[in-house]
């Protein structure tokens, strides 16, 4: 079970009574039973593997019921994020995305990748899109190889964002050239989300 980056001692425990006795769960495991997954903090390989595992588990439990992915992330690794993205597209259940707090960089990309019509932003959340970051040191030939790779990744991410947002590729390429911060309403107008929520629908 992926427990977001919160000190373990501070993670609440939920106790449930049943005819079989008493069971306790950490709050994130309990919410997973309700098909809720949290993507919080930096996107990195360990987090991505655990989120992918949770999505695959929930698909096996019920392939016809939505999965709810709550995002509060500054972004992070592109390859880790793409593992989550590809799984979201691969599995049968719709993945409903919610931005709470912030969805920046890869966080915004994953927010936008939710099921069409089921992408939400809470009204005071912030969304930020930009081009991928990279840095490399070494021989000139190696730097050239890595420069080609990051340009390929930039083009791929922009094409996918254009596809999910409904914007044309040229506008996405222009708008992601530098850090581009948006309110929840601006993210809706851009096509990154479908609705801004202040109350549960």
UniProtKB/Swiss-Prot annotation:
It holds the Pfam family CLP_protease. One of its GO terms (biological process) is protein quality control for misfolded or incompletely synthesized proteins. Its EC number is 3.4.21.92. It catalyses: Hydrolysis of proteins to small peptides in the presence of ATP and magnesium. alpha-casein is the usual test substrate. In the absence of ATP, only oligopeptides shorter than five residues are hydrolyzed (such as succinyl-Leu-Tyr-|-NHMec, and Leu-Tyr-Leu-|-Tyr-Trp, in which cleavage of the -Tyr-|-Leu- and -Tyr-|-Trp bonds also occurs). GO terms for cellular component: cytoplasm; endopeptidase Clp complex. InterPro entries: ClpP, ClpP/crotonase-like_dom_sf, ClpP/TepA, ClpP_His_AS, ClpP_Ser_AS. It is found in: Cytoplasm. Keywords: Cytoplasm, Hydrolase, Protease, Serine protease. The active site is at residues 105, 130. One of its GO terms (molecular function) is ATP-dependent peptidase activity. Cleaves peptides in various proteins in a process that requires ATP hydrolysis. Has a chymotrypsin-like activity. Plays a major role in the degradation of misfolded proteins. Fourteen ClpP subunits assemble into 2 heptameric rings which stack back to back to give a disk-like structure with a central cavity, resembling the structure of eukaryotic proteasomes. Belongs to the peptidase S14 family. PANTHER family: ATP-DEPENDENT CLP PROTEASE PROTEOLYTIC SUBUNIT. NCBIfam families: clpP (TIGR00493), PRK00277.1 (NF001368), PRK12553.1 (NF009205). This is ATP-dependent Clp protease proteolytic subunit. It comes from Acinetobacter baylyi (strain ATCC 33305 / BD413 / ADP1). The lineage of its organism: Bacteria, Pseudomonadati, Pseudomonadota, Gammaproteobacteria, Moraxellales.
């Amino acid at each position: 079970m992926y427990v977001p980056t919160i000190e373990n001692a501070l993670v609440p425990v939920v106790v449930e009574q049943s005819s079989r006795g008493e069971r306790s769960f950490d709050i994130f495991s309990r919410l997973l039973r309700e098909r809720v997954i949290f993507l919080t903090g930096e996107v990195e390989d360990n987090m991505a593997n655990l989120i992918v595992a949770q999505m695959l588990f929930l698909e096996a439990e019920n392939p016809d019921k939505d999965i709810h992915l709550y995002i509060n992330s500054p972004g992070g690794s592109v390859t880790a994020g793409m593992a989550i993205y590809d799984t979201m597209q691969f599995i049968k259940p719709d993945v409903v995305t919610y931005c709470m707090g912030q969805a920046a960089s890869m966080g915004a990309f994953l927010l936008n990748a939710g099921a069409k019509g089921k992408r939400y932003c809470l009204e005071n959340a912030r969304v930020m899109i930009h081009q991928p970051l990279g840095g490399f040191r070494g021989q000139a030939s190696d730097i050239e190889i890595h420069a080609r790779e990051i340009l390929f990744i930039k083009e791929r991410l922009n094409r996918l964002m254009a596809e999910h947002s409904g914007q044309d590729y040229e506008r996405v390429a222009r708008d992601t050239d530098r850090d581009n911060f948006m309110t929840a309403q601006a993210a809706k107008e851009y096509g990154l989300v479908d609705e801004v929520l202040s109350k549960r629908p």
